Amino acid sequence: MGRRLLPVVLSTLMLVSGCTSASYDLLETASVAKPRFQDTDPQDFGVNNPHRHDIHGIDVSKWNGDVDWQQVRKSGVSFVFIKATEGSDRIDPKFNDHWRLAAKADILHAPYHFYYFCSTADAQADWFIQNVPKEAVTLPPVLDVEWNPSSPTCKTRPAPMVVRAEMQRFLDRLEKHYGKRPIIYTSVDFHRDNLVGQFKDYHFWVRSVAAHPTKIYEDRRWAFWQYTATGVVPGVTGPTDINVFSGSEKNWKSWVTTASK
């Protein structure tokens, strides 16, 4: 996405993601198919229930195995984030199957990269670009940044200034190659340690499974909210991460049109 277009899109998302449950109903919406999802361990979000949102999506990796994407589409899924790469030497073995079949089912999709702080930003950007063709990027690519304490090879936690510098280099490389400004995915602790008040001109996809993001992420406007890791989605075997877009269907169509250029 061109830098000149970003302020327009961000102003729209700042409006919709800052809405209360009362003002959300005032947004202009169109009729959409009601999602047919369940959750094996649902969280009570009160009036901020994610099901109040119009646009729902999932994220997948090799751990989800084979997916019936036609059934996923019929269940009410509008978008999918698909794991592509990790570090500077790993590709998700299901990536190509997932994005090609999601595309065939007319589901908008974006690849994501799981960042390791044990190799350089350039090495990881090179690896992502080498393995992710431009046709696999219908929505902006995603940089997934979170601490990884269970990793057998990389538990490194650089200082915040180092983290942000590496992120910026990686983001710049991807934006230059794909022509779309990447989305940033993050977790509560990583955001607290490194990202509060930073990267305000990027769209954020946030993990918040215990409370609404406005209660967890300090001063952060979000575009996507991952609200559960225990979802049940027709067409996907086993627990599934489910997400919502912050605005209405009209906002979604506008965002996709702009972000996909």
What feature does the model see in each segment?
Residues M1-V9:
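Bacterial N-terminal signal peptides that target proteins for export
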Residues P50-D66, K83-R169, E175-H177:
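Substrate-binding cleft of extracellular glycoside hydrolase catalytic domains
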Residues N49-R52, R73-G76, K104, K134-V137, ...:
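Extracellular/periplasmic catalytic domains that process cell-envelope and extracellular macromolecules
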Residues P140-E218:
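Catalytic domains of cell-wall/extracellular-matrix polysaccharide-remodeling enzymes
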Residues Y24-G57, F199-K261:
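Functionally critical loop-and-helix segments that line ligand-binding/catalytic clefts
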Residues L15-G18:
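C-terminal motif of bacterial Sec signal peptides marking the signal peptidase cleavage site
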